[in-house]
A protein has these predicted regions:
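Conserved helicase/translocase motor-coupling segment
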Residues: 1-57
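Conserved RecA-like P-loop NTPase helicase motor core
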Residues: 44-165
Length: 167
């Protein structure tokens, strides 16, 4: 799997450096599972631009316009087995869709008009050992958002949702 993570890292760097419309590091946002994050250290993704898949209820990333979603999301197999044993259908693709949309909406997609927001700059360690986010107030406006999704399944789920055709 080292070959896979190296290949994915190279593809991610290629997206951020060559394909993205905005190549500034400050505009990047990416995610993967936390235990895979270590494989991307030193990449062009930038450690400061990582945003956990579970992050909710924040506007601090409203200036991010170049996104990379490095997850192929599935339910925990134990949860699926629990519901399956009770003849309850669990919507697997809808779960994946919900996660990717919620994560994407941490970015500039949530910006409807020009506004000021507090954006994340860095982590600061307080004297008592607490980790505190250092923010800066900036003006943002709606911009085009690009997203790199290497998983064919996740791309298809997202495309099918946005380009749903009732025919």
């Amino acid at each position: 799997s080292n070959i896979i993570t190296n290949s994915l890292r190279k593809s991610l760097d290629n997206f951020f450096n060559n394909q993205a419309h905005d190549k500034r590091s400050s505009k990047r946002m990416w995610t993967t599972f936390k235990n895979f994050r270590k494989y991307f250290r030193g990449s062009r993704a930038g450690e400061r631009n990582f945003l956990s898949i579970g992050t909710r209820a924040t506007n601090m990333y409203g200036h991010k316009t170049v996104l990379a979603y490095l997850i192929n999301r599935f339910h925990n197999p134990d949860i699926l087995q629990f519901f399956s044993a009770r003849d309850i259908r669990v919507p697997v693709d809808e779960y994946a869709l919900s996660d990717i949309i919620q994560w994407m909406f941490r970015s500039n997609l949530r910006i409807e008009r020009e506004q000021e927001i507090d954006v994340f700059r860095e982590w600061k360690i307080e004297d008592n050992g607490d980790k505190v986010a250092v923010t800066e107030r900036i003006k943002v406006e709606p911009e085009t958002v690009e997203i790199y999704i290497p998983s064919y399944r996740m791309r298809k789920i997202l495309k099918d949702y946005f380009w749903f055709d009732e025919r």
